[in-house]
């Protein structure tokens, strides 16, 4: 993998082997040492006016390893479910459009977690995995600890009825099925990481 895009809510840091001039970033930084790298991350977390940074290094494997060490890593999995009608399954949580996903439990297989989370959050059964999609990364802080969450995504198929039940206990207020041509109008109500996934998997 030549790039890693890590989301900080609707901002992001791009990790790459060389400067990614195709994108419009506020800042470019070449990786030299971990001390400077961790200062860049800390400053980015606190300065919300910076929308994006590109950190690059020819040895991207080493850079990515050092970047991850800054955080406590957690794993999650979720699904992009396509109904035989052509609609895709979405949830609404905290006022934002999203996809069903959740933390991988201890000893749980990633694929089984993704299937379970779709069932629990949306109230459907009988869906199955078609293939994996590229993972997404985002950060969050809890009780003074910075976490890096890797979410493994899977394209799923479903041919059952479209009756759903949102998991209210998880803050999910709505579950809906949307056609691809409805997705361009939801950008203002979706996370940037979700739009990346939609653009890659549905709209391209």
Language-model regions: role of each:
Residues 28-31, 82-120, 124:
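Conserved Nudix-box catalytic region and its N-terminal flanking loop in Nudix hydrolases
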Residues 13, 20-23, 96-98, 106, ...:
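Short, surface-exposed beta-strand-loop junctions and turns on beta-sheet-rich folds
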Residues 104-193:
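Unchanged
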Residues 34-78:
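Acidic, metal-coordinating catalytic segment for phosphate/diphosphate chemistry
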Residues 3, 76, 149-153:
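Short hydrophobic/aromatic beta-strand or adjacent loop that forms the aromatic wall/cage
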Residues 81-84, 156-158:
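Active-site beta-strand termini and strand-to-loop segments that position acidic
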Residues 1-46:
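N-terminal leader/capping segments at the start of a protein or of a new domain
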Residues 193-204:
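Charged phosphate-binding loop/patch that engages nucleotide di/tri-phosphates or the phosphate backbone
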């Amino acid at each position: 993998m030549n790039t890693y895009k890590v989301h900080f809510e609707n901002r992001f840091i791009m990790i790459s082997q060389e400067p990614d001039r195709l994108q419009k970033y506020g800042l470019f930084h070449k990786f030299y040492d971990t001390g400077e790298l961790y200062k860049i991350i800390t400053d980015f977390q606190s300065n919300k006016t910076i929308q994006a940074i590109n950190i690059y290094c020819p040895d991207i494997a080493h850079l990515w390893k050092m970047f991850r060490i800054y955080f406590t890593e957690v794993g999650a999995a979720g699904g992009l479910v396509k109904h035989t009608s052509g609609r895709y399954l979405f949830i609404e949580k905290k006022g934002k459009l999203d996809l069903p996903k959740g933390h991988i439990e201890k000893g749980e297989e990633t694929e089984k977690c993704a299937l379970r989370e779709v069932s629990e959050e949306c109230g459907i059964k009988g869906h199955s995995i078609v293939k994996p999609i590229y993972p997404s990364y985002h950060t969050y802080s809890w009780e003074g600890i910075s976490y890096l969450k890797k979410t493994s995504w899977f394209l799923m198929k479903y041919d059952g009825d479209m009756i759903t039940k949102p998991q209210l206990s998880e803050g999910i207020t709505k579950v809906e099925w949307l056609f691809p041509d409805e997705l361009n109008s939801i950008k203002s109500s979706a996370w940037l990481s979700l739009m990346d996934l939609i653009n890659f998997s549905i709209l391209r």
